[in-house]
Structures are given as structure tokens and as C-alpha cells.
């Protein structure tokens, strides 16, 4: 037995009377988010046991809360069906929800380390609550939970609230940027991070599958819209970014045939090929269309055996990378040349791998890489003395 993380004892008298003893277990049970987990509080009337797991007292996002409620307003022989319709039960439930959320807000404000421990164990429940508000509770649930969320960022490997993120935003920043990945290292290495890092813009790190789904429901925080660094344009409004954008448009116009032929070569693997204004040192990246699902969402749906939701893939190429100049040169041989097709395939495969996705035919890609390496070796390996002789 471990001491509970939090204990709340309340005795309420008035129009409705009840005593509650609630607690958060020290650790989340292994099956908290599985279908076999049974949430609910014990229900008593005048110290007489009525029900073991009453699910109707607390919302689903507080399923981790344990404890009991004792109220004289319940009949001892009330059926489960009548209990679900009970006005008293609903009033008690609303009061309990307020009590718990108030306690969490106070802990966040007065004992940050304790709240972070709570977040580590049960934060996912609150995020699932926001995502589930689409079907139950709507904006009311979002407003209750949004200030309790914590995330790490590109600048700080520590948890911060959305309010703290917004307070630290430069005045010129109009959006809350976020990135998804399995861990910090995988996000740090994303090509899309380069320009934001250079400009000192902080990025929220979403490391849990449910994070982006919850944010999609929220849409914005304090008037600042959320924006994935891997979806659509970054919409950076500073002078330097606008100049780069104009330069990129000029390069794209002078390379229209090349871009068109790359798209033709890749076919329906990509929806669009673009000259990138966001890449700094990387040759290529994949971004998703702003209106559709992200790559992380696509993967989450696939993991849930629902592969119907696909991100609209846009291949972005860095015009200042050496590979772009090489691609232009190879394109002069014609779009049907083997070299041009190989370069297009390898650039797309590289973009997939950066996003943590596998090419459709890894073996074919490996063979193309081996062929290019062999050609490179022939070009740069000096003849042996025997060859000279």
C-alpha cells in the first residue's frame, strides 16, 4: 500500500447533503486507459453500502479518482436505472468535479513539483477529456481543463502551461507552434525546426499520441491559433521571412518544369512539390496539408486499424542545398532518364525517413543508394599503382 498522491475530504450541508472522501492513487493503474478498467466511486446512504463503482458521479476524464460518497438523500433500495436519473446524484457529481478541479488548480499554483508528479501519472486523462469533449461537454470541458495542461518545449526541457508559453511569446509571434514526435531527439532533428530555432521561436513538444488530437479540438488558446510545424506554411511575418518567401517564389517560377516533372515522377505519392522557404541546411522535408490530418494523426489512425485517414503529402525541396543544383543538372538529361527518376525517389524516401515513415519498397531504395555510392567511389577513388602500370 502506498500513501495516496492527494486526499480530499468534504462534508456538505444545505439543499443537498453528502460527505465525500476522494483520493488520487500514488500511481496510475496499468490498465487505466483499457476497456477492462472500471472507474467509479463507492456510494453509501447513511453509512449503508449501495454501490461499488458508480460511474455517473464523475466525468470520464476523472476516471482515475477513487473514494466514496455518503448521502442521506439516496434511497437504500434505489435501482441503478433510477440512480442514473437522480437529480441529487447529478448535483453531487457537479460539486465533486468542481472540488477536484479546484484542488488541481491550487496544486499547480502552489506546489508545482507535486502537480508535475500528478501530470506524469494522470495528465493523459485530462487530454483525453479535451479530445472527448467533441462528443460530450464541448467548449465547457475545454475551458475547465485548458489551464491544467503541461508540455515541454524546444527551449526548455521542463513542463510549462499554455499560459506560460503565451506570456513568453514575442509580440510579433501570432501563432502557438507545436511539433509531434516519439521523443525530444526525434523532434529536435526535424528539418522544419531549423528556421524556428534560428529565429528563437519556442515550439511545444507533443510526445503523446493524444496531444495533437486534443489541440485540434481546442484550435486556439487566448486568441492564438495552434499551428503544427509540419503542416502548411509557417506564416512567419518578420521582414527576413517575407524576403525569403519572395526569393523562393522567384526560384520556383524559374524551375517550374523541374517541379512539375518531379511531381509527375513521384505520381500520387505526393499531392504537391514545392520549393521550400523553411529549410536551412536540410535538402528536403515532407509537410502535410493544413486542412487534412497530420502525419502523426495518420499513424495513430493506422495503429488503430483505421488506415482511411491519410495526410496530403507535400514534398518541399531546399533550393540552396547542393542536391538541388545536382537535381537541376540531372533534369537536363530528361525527365525519363534513370538518374532523374532515382534522384526523385531517393529525395522522397529521405523525406519519409525524416518523418519516421518507411518507404514503400525499402529494398529498392537501398539498392539505389548502393548504386550511387558505387558511382561516387569510382569518381573519387584514385587508380592503384597496378592500374597506372
Task: Give the location of each predicted region.
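Conserved GHKL (Bergerat-fold) ATPase module
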Residues: 1-379
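Conserved small/polar residues in nucleotide/adenosyl-binding loops
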Residues: 380-387
Amino acid at each position: 500500500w502506498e500513501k495516496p498522491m492527494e486526499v480530499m475530504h468534504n462534508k456538505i450541508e444545505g439543499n443537498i447533503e453528502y460527505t465525500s472522501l476522494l483520493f488520487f492513487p500514488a500511481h496510475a493503474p496499468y490498465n487505466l486507459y483499457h476497456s477492462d478498467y472500471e472507474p467509479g466511486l463507492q456510494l453509501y446512504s447513511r453509512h449503508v453500502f449501495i454501490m461499488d463503482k458508480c460511474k455517473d458521479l464523475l466525468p470520464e476524464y476523472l476516471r482515475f479518482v477513487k473514494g466514496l460518497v455518503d448521502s442521506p438523500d439516496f434511497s437504500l433500495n434505489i435501482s441503478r436505472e433510477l440512480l442514473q436519473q437522480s437529480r441529487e446524484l447529478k448535483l453531487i457529481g457537479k460539486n465533486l468535479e468542481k472540488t477536484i478541479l479546484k484542488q488541481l488548480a491550487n496544486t499547480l499554483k502552489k506546489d508545482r513539483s507535486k502537480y508535475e508528479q500528478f501530470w506524469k501519472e494522470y495528465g493523459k486523462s485530462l487530454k483525453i477529456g479535451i479530445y472527448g469533449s467533441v462528443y460530450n461537454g464541448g467548449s465547457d470541458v475545454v475551458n475547465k481543463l485548458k489551464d491544467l495542461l503541461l508540455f515541454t518545449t524546444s527551449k526548455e526541457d521542463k513542463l510549462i502551461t499554455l499560459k506560460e508559453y503565451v506570456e513568453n511569446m514575442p509580440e510579433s509571434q501570432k501563432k502557438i507552434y507545436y511539433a509531434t514526435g516519439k521523443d525530444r531527439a526525434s523532434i529536435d532533428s526535424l528539418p522544419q525546426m531549423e528556421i524556428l530555432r534560428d529565429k528563437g521561436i519556442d515550439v511545444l513538444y507533443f510526445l503523446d499520441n493524444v496531444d495533437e488530437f486534443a489541440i485540434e479540438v481546442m484550435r486556439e488558446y487566448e486568441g492564438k491559433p495552434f499551428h503544427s510545424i509540419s503542416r502548411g506554411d509557417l506564416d512567419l511575418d518578420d521582414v527576413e521571412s517575407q524576403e525569403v518567401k519572395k526569393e523562393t517564389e522567384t526560384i520556383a517560377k524559374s524551375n517550374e518544369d523541374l517541379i512539375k516533372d518531379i511531381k509527375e515522377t513521384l505520381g500520387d505519392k505526393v499531392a504537391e512539390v514545392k520549393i521550400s522557404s523553411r529549410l536551412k541546411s536540410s535538402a528536403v522535408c515532407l509537410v502535410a496539408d493544413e486542412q487534412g490530418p497530420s502525419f502523426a494523426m495518420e499513424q495513430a489512425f493506422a495503429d488503430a486499424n483505421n488506415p482511411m485517414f491519410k495526410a496530403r503529402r507535400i514534398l518541399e525541396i531546399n533550393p540552396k542545398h547542393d542536391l538541388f543544383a545536382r537535381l537541376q543538372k540531372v533534369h537536363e538529361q530528361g525527365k525519363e532518364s534513370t538518374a532523374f527518376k532515382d534522384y526523385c525517389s531517393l529525395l522522397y524516401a529521405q523525406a519519409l525517413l525524416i518523418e519516421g515513415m518507411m518507404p514503400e519498397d525499402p529494398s529498392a531504395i537501398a539498392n539505389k543508394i548502393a548504386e550511387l555510392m558505387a558511382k561516387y567511389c569510382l569518381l573519387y577513388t584514385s587508380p592503384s599503382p597496378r592500374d597506372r602500370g
